[in-house]
Swiss-Prot record:
HAMAP family, per database record: Xylose_isom_A
Primary location group: cytoplasm
EC class: isomerase
Name this polypeptide is given: Xylose isomerase
EC number: 5.3.1.5
C-alpha cells in the first residue's frame, strides 16, 4: 500500500463543502480576467520539503516515518520517492513540481556516481511526467548541504569546490532542459560569509559573477529556452548572503552585465527576513525588470529564521497578485510551494491539508486582486498623483532639458511655492479591504 493510497483525489466542491479533502475556492477552469485560474496560478509542489525533509530540527532528529526514508539501496529509495511524489502531485491536481538535483537522486560516493545517478533518475522523472502530464516548473542544484560547501560553492576559496558546483549546475540545467522545465533557479545557500575576518569580498563577488556568466553561456550553447532565476535571501545559513534582496541582486547582475539574462524567484519568507514585505519585493522586481517566479510560503515575524510555512494570508497575497496581474501575469514562472508541514504534523493527511489550504488561499487572493484590477482605483490615484511628471515641464526635466543650474534659475524666476497634497493612504487601504472582503461570495 502506498503512503497516499487511502486518500482521495482532491477536487473542487465549492465554498459550502464540509469535505476536508476538497478545494473550496480553487476551481482550475474558472475564468479570471479571461484566463483559467490554473493558468494564472501555475501551482507547483516542491520535492525537498515534501519528500526529503525528515522532520528534524537542530534540537532533535526526524519525526516523520516516510517509506522512502527507510534504509536500503539509495537508487531504489529514489525510485520509491518518485512514485509517491507523482502520486501526490496527481491527487492534488497540481500542474507543476520543482526539485533540487539531490532531492531526486542520491549523490553517491564520487562525482562520477553523482552524474550517473542523476541521469538515471532524470529518465525516471521523464517517464513519470509522460504518464501523468505533470510538468517541471523549475529545477536547481543543491550547492549547500554537503560539507564541501561549508564555505560556499561559487564563492568558495577552493577552486575545486567551484568546479564540483559547476558540474552539479551543468547536470541540473541539462536535466531541467530535457524535462521541459520552464525555468532554472540559482540559489546561493552559502554564497556569503560568517565573518569578514577570513573573507575577501571583492574576490568572492568576482567568482560568483564568473559562475553566473558561465551558466548563462551554457544556457545559450545548449539552447535552453527557460528563464534563469536567482532567489534572493539575506541570511541563513550564512550570516550575510550576497543575494540579500531583489535590489541587491539587480545591482549584482548589472555589475556583471547579466541584467538581461537572469531574473529573480521571490520567496515570501525571504522577504520577511530581509525586512521587506512580499508586496515590496514583487513590486521592486517588476520596477527593475527582473521579475520571474514566486516561492509561496510565509514566515513568522516573531522568529528570525526561515520557517517555510504554508501561506494563509489572503490580505498579503492579494497585493502580491495585484502587482503580478497589473504587469501581465506570469510568463515562465508560477507559484511554487516552498513550504513544509510542521514537525508534529506526521501523517500523510497533513501534507494534503497543507497544500489544499494554501491553494485555496491563492485562489481567493487571485480573485480579490482581479477585483482590484477591474476597478483599478489604485492605478488611477497613482496616475493623478504623478500627473505633473507627464506635463511638458516634467518630461523636459527627465529628458535632460534642464541642468541643475538652469532648473534652479527657472524655479526662482517663476517664484514657485509648491504645496504638499494628501497621500490618501487611509482611503487606499480602505479600497484594498473593500476588494478583499466585499467581493466575498
Amino acid at each position: 500500500m502506498s503512503y497516499f493510497e487511502h486518500l482521495p483525489a482532491v477536487r473542487y466542491e465549492g465554498p459550502q463543502t464540509d469535505n476536508p479533502f476538497a478545494y473550496r475556492h480553487y476551481d482550475k477552469d474558472k475564468l479570471v480576467l479571461g484566463k483559467r485560474m490554473e493558468d494564472h496560478l501555475r501551482v507547483a509542489v516542491c520535492y525537498w520539503h515534501t519528500f526529503v525533509w525528515p522532520g528534524a530540527d537542530m534540537f532533535g532528529p526526524g519525526t516523520f516515518e516516510r517509506p522512502w526514508h527507510h534504509a536500503g539501496d539509495a537508487l531504489e529509495m529514489a525510485h520509491a520517492k518518485a512514485d509517491h511524489a507523482f502520486e501526490l502531485f496527481s491527487k492534488l491536481g497540481t500542474p507543476f513540481y520543482t526539485f533540487h538535483d539531490l532531492d531526486v537522486a542520491p549523490e553517491g560516493d564520487s562525482i562520477k556516481s553523482y552524474v550517473n545517478n542523476f541521469k538515471a533518475m532524470t529518465d525516471v522523472l521523464a517517464r513519470k511526467q509522460e504518464q501523468t502530464g505533470i510538468k517541471l516548473l523549475w529545477g536547481t542544484a543543491n550547492l549547500f548541504s554537503h560539507p564541501r560547501y561549508a564555505a560556499g560553492a561559487a564563492t568558495n576559496p577552493n577552486p575545486d569546490v567551484f568546479a564540483f558546483a559547476a558540474t552539479q549546475v551543468l547536470n541540473a540545467l541539462e536535466a531541467t532542459q530535457r524535462l521541459g522545465g520552464a525555468n532554472y533557479v540559482l540559489w546561493g545557500g552559502r554564497e556569503g560569509y560568517e565573518t569578514l575576518l577570513n573573507t575577501d569580498l571583492k574576490r568572492e563577488r568576482e567568482q560568483l559573477g564568473r559562475f553566473m556568466s558561465m551558466v548563462v553561456e551554457h544556457k545559450h550553447k545548449t539552447g535552453f529556452k527557460g528563464a534563469l532565476l536567482i532567489e534572493p535571501k539575506p541570511q541563513e545559513p550564512t550570516k550575510h548572503q550576497y543575494d540579500y534582496d531583489v535590489a541587491t541582486v539587480h545591482g549584482f547582475l548589472t555589475q556583471f552585465g547579466l541584467q538581461d539574462e537572469i531574473r529573480v524567484n521571490i520567496e515570501a519568507n525571504h522577504a520577511t527576513l530581509a525586512g521587506h514585505s512580499f508586496h515590496h519585493e514583487i513590486a521592486n522586481a517588476f520596477a527593475l525588470g527582473i521579475f520571474g517566479s514566486v516561492d509561496a510560503n510565509r514566515g513568522d515575524a516573531q522568529n528570525g529564521w526561515d520557517t517555510d510555512q504554508f501561506p494563509n494570508s489572503v490580505e498579503e497575497l492579494t497585493l502580491a497578485f495585484y502587482e503580478i496581474l497589473r504587469n501581465g501575469g506570469f510568463t515562465t514562472g508560477g507559484m511554487n510551494f516552498d513550504a513544509k508541514v510542521r514537525r508534529q504534523s506526521i501523517d500523510p493527511e497533513d501534507i494534503v491539508h497543507g497544500h489544499i489550504g494554501a491553494i485555496d488561499v491563492l485562489a481567493v487572493a487571485l480573485e480579490r486582486a482581479a477585483h482590484l484590477i477591474e476597478h483599478d482605483r489604485l492605478a488611477a490615484f497613482k496616475q493623478q498623483r504623478y500627473a505633473g511628471w507627464d506635463s511638458d515641464f516634467g518630461r523636459k526635466i527627465l529628458a535632460g532639458g534642464y541642468s541643475l543650474e538652469s532648473l534652479a534659475s527657472d524655479a526662482v524666476q517663476r517664484n514657485i511655492a509648491p504645496r504638499h497634497v494628501s497621500g490618501q493612504q487611509e482611503r487606499l487601504e480602505n479600497i484594498v479591504n473593500q476588494a478583499i472582503f466585499s467581493s466575498a461570495k
